[in-house]
Amino acid sequence: MEDSMDMDNIAPLRPQNFLFGCELKADKKEYSFKVEDDENEHQLSLRTVSLGASAKDELHVVEAEGINYEGKTIKIALASLKPSVQPTVSLGGFEITPPVILRLKSGSGPVYVSGQHLVALEDLESSDDEDEEHEPSPKNAKRIAPDSASKVPRKKTRLEEEEEDSDEDDDDDEDDDDEDDDEEEEETPVKKTDSTKSKAAQKLNHNGKASALSTTQKTPKTPEQKGKQDTKPQTPKTPKTPLSSEEIKAKMQTYLEKGNVLPKVEVKFANYVKNCFRTENQKVIEDLWKWRQSLKDGK
């Protein structure tokens, strides 16, 4: 946790490139590249090593001295140049972490080394913007609190969950039938109100008086006619058949194979069967208890 918090608090780095160049010759064969800035990260990226126009036709060897991964001093040859054979070498971005010493090991020069000085500066402006974006509003914090507190874990046996799921499916079917009946009953008065509004919205005379509505009104329906319209056939609900003894045994066997345990006392076992499998048949319960005692798993 602490490492992740430290990584979040680190501001993003904004790289800056600066030109770098040095000259190595007979009277100055070494160039030391050191950085005293400890707050930012620095790197030296070497691009080319080339001979000057006045260089003699002899072998020029340029080496670099730095620190390896283990913190020990190491020397490597960067380029071997000769005016008549190879006057320049492209290093293609040879990056070295300072301190670095560039040295003309052989030859009189002049030799020119060019590249880039890379500095990674902290982008304070972007870090401030990110802090503002990550600050949660007080309204959101108040809304999150009750939601997290209202979550309470529940543990149930798998057999109880299966039985409850089957009961919920039956209840949902009954609720759907009731909702369909309610919607059909609600549609009837809506149609009546629409018809009365259309009757009242007849054209007015030029004098501003409404025409007689007696001829356009419908005759009221008798209670017998209303009863015929309201009474609609409903699909009969199929009663839920209780599970047989063999079906209950199969479910209990699956329950045991998953590492669970059945009650060992007859009274508790009977209550378990009644609650989980919704059966009141005493013969079925006695048959299941005999089967429970005959199990060889010892559970």
From Swiss-Prot:
Its main location: cytoplasm. Sequence repeats lie at residues 218-220, 221-223, 237-239, 240-242. SUPFAM superfamilies: Nucleoplasmin-like core domain (SSF69203). Keywords: Chaperone, Cytoplasm, Nucleus, Phosphoprotein, Repeat, RNA-binding. The record marks D57, K82 as: Interaction between pentamers. Phosphorylated. Residues 125-134, 160-187 have a biased composition (Acidic residues). Gene3D superfamilies: 1.10.10.2100, Nucleoplasmin core domain. Residues 232-242 have a biased composition (Low complexity). It is found in: Cytoplasm; Nucleus, Nucleoplasm; Nucleus, Nucleolus. InterPro entries: NPM1_C, Nucleoplasmin, Nucleoplasmin_core_dom, Nucleoplasmin_core_dom_sf. One of its GO terms (biological process) is ribosomal large subunit biogenesis. Residues 125-247 are annotated as: Disordered. The keyword Nucleus applies. A motif (Nuclear localization signal) lies at residues 153-158, 189-195. It comes from the Eukaryota. Residues 218-242 are annotated as: 4 X 3 AA repeats of K-T-P. One of its GO terms (molecular function) is RNA binding. Residues 188-197, 221-231 have a biased composition (Basic and acidic residues). GO terms for cellular component: centrosome; cytoplasm; nucleolus; nucleoplasm; ribonucleoprotein complex. Acts as a chaperonin for the core histones H3, H2B and H4. Associated with nucleolar ribonucleoprotein structures and bind single-stranded nucleic acids. It may function in the assembly and/or transport of ribosome. May stimulate endonuclease activity on apurinic/apyrimidinic (AP) double-stranded DNA. May inhibit endonuclease activity on AP single-stranded RNA. Belongs to the nucleoplasmin family. This is Nucleophosmin. It comes from Xenopus laevis. The gene is npm1.
